[in-house]
Amino acid sequence: MIGIDTNILVRYLTEDDLVQSVKATELIKKYFGQENSIFINNIVICELVWVLEKGYKYSKEQIIMVLKEIFSTVEFSFENQQILWLSILEYETHKTDFLIF
């Protein structure tokens, strides 16, 4: 299992930097088909939401879609997936910032 940081996840998702995006994608593709082989901690998720919202001007709906897609990816493992799902539901249904309880 490897751990990835916010930068790798942002580059993979946004494909905003040709060189870094290719490297991030290649790294993640090495683990395709291997369940729970890429660890993402809670801080990375919080930073991802902040970067997508503030830096890339993603809407709340776009961020929710990205988070649900990430959490549905079998290769990714999380610090506490149940709490993260609850955080997404809270974020989706209330006028709040994204918080991990």
Predicted regions and their residues:
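Short, well-structured N-terminal submotif of metal-dependent ribonuclease cores
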Residues: 1-40, 55-61
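Acidic active-site catalytic centers that drive phospho-/nucleotidyl reactions
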Residues: 5-7, 47, 100
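Short beta->alpha linker loops
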Residues: 43-44, 82
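Amphipathic alpha-helical segments within well-ordered protein domains
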Residues: 49, 53, 68-71, 88
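Glycine/small-residue-rich phosphate/adenosyl-binding loop
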Residues: 57-67, 71, 75
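Active-site neighborhoods of divalent-metal-dependent phosphate/nucleic-acid chemistry enzymes
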Residues: 75-101
